[in-house]
Amino acid sequence: MSTRLLDAVTVHHGDCIEVLRGLPSGSVDSIVTDPPYGIRFMGQAWDGADIARRTQQGLDSSKAAPKGTRGPHGGYRSASVEAGRYSRSRRDSWAFQQWCEEWACEALRVLKPGGFMLAFGGSRTWHRLACAVEDAGFEVRDSIAWLYGSGFPKSVDVARAVNERRTHGEAVSSAAWEGWGTALKPSFEPCVVARRPLEGTVADNVLTHGVGGLNIDACRIHSAGSEGRETYVGRTKDGRWPSNVLLDEEAARSLDAEAPESGSRQGKPRSAATSGAGWGMRATGAEYSDAGGPSRFFPVFRYEAKASTDERPSVGGVSHPTVKPLALMRWLVRLVTPYGGVVLDPFAGSGTTLEAAVAEGMRAIGVEREESYLPLIQERFARGIEVPLNLFSLDSETS
C-alpha cells in the first residue's frame, strides 16, 4: 500500500526488500536511513524480532554460511529471528549481516550511479552492516561518528553479582570487584557513508546522473552555526570544511571544558609550491580569524535524550523509540542530495528523514513495514512542514 502525503512525499507500507524490488532502477538520488541495529533497545525489541520472516534466501550455494543455518532441503534458513536482540551467536550475527546485504543490494540498484547512502548502525553491530553494504556492491567511502552525551550505560555491577553468588550457602567476598562493571556509557552512533560506483570519472558521472559528490559548501561549519553556544570569538567567512565527527550540544560543552581555547589566524588560502602538489590541488587550505573551544571544528546539533513533542509524534499512545534529531537528519540529507532530488528511506520509522528531505527542498520516498508507525508519519506531516516555495515548481522545470 502506498500513501501520498504531499506532492513531494510517498510512503509505502510493506517489507523494505519487497517494496524496493518494485522501484525503478536508478530512480533515487540518495538514501539516508536508520535501519535496525540487530540489538534490543531498553528492553524493547524495536528492531522487529521477526526479521526472519522476510529473510528467506537461497544461499544453499554459499560455503561460508555457518553450520546450522541451512534448511532441511539445503536452502538458507534465516537465523535472524534473533536479530531483534544482540546475540553472541555467530549464526545470528551472520543472519543479520545477510539480511543487511539483501536490502543493500536492492538499495544499490535503485540508486543512481554515484549516489550516496548514509546508514546508521549500532556500535556493536555496525561492522556487520558495513560488510554487508560493501558486499552488496557499494564503495564504503567513509564513516560518520554522531557523538552525544546523554547515553545510559547498561552495565552489571560485578561486585554485586559476586556478592549474590553463594557457594555452599556462604557469601563470596566481593571486595576485590568493587567499582567494576561490564559496559561503557554509549556516546556515539556510527553512520556508514557508501556510494554506488561511478560511471566514468566524477565529472562524467555528475554531468550524466546529477550525483556523485558531497555538498561541502551547504554543510560547512560556521561560527554562528549553533544556538546557545559560547564557543566562538570572531566569525569565519565561508565556514570550515565539514568533518566526519558530529556532536550534540552536551558533547560540545564537555569537549570545550576539557581543552583550552585556541585561536586561528586570518590569512589567505595557502597554495602548493607547484601545480599538482597537495593531492592534485592548487589551493590547500585557508586560515580562519576566530577563537574558541575545539568544538568549533565540528558540526553541532541540538540533541535530547527523548526528542521533543514537536519531533516525536505520538498517536494512540504509540511512538517510535529511536527518533534522530531533525537538524541532524537535515544536515545529512543536504550533504548527499542535490536540491530537488529524491531521498529514499527504506526504514522510515516516524518519518524524520522524510520531513528533513522536504524541509531541505527535496522529494522523499519512505518504506515502513510496521503498521503502527504509519499514523506517526501521517501525524508528522499533518502538523505542517515549511516547504521551500519553489519545490513544487521543479516538475515543470525538469520535465
Residue ranges of model-derived segments:
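S-adenosyl-L-methionine-dependent nucleic acid methyltransferase catalytic domains
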Residues: 1-399
